[in-house]
Amino acid sequence: MELKGSKTERNLREAFAGETQARSKYDYFASVAKKEGYEQIAAIFQATANNEKEHAKMWFKALGGIGTTAENLASAAAGENYEWTDMYDRMAQEAEEEGFTELAEKFRQVGRIEKAHEERYRALLSNVEMQRVFEKSEETMWECRNCGHLVI
């Protein structure tokens, strides 16, 4: 059976979008509850957000959305490129046309950030492809991300 183009593929994409949006909302809601002193409610929002994350991962995997690190970097760079070259540019223009100048500027600002994200992912992808991730041409200090041990 071919998933591509099927109703099931469309449903997987909808489920993934719904779960990722719910996760983000619940993270935000948890922050508000915590600031207002509702620790238990914050914890429940956070636990539910973590559940939604796992649901989203299941649907994303079913869509074939998780590959090797190189594939993931290329995919991430392409997504960031779309966001800054198309999506946010269009959204800024439309917001401007409708008189939402502050939102238009925010769209533009985020677009500039997305461009930096794309550049960062492309640089990392180049390092992976050229096998330079763990090698540097100059003397470098490396820090263990777990315990903090330093090596020169």
Give the location of each predicted region.
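Non-heme di-metal
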Residues: M1-I152
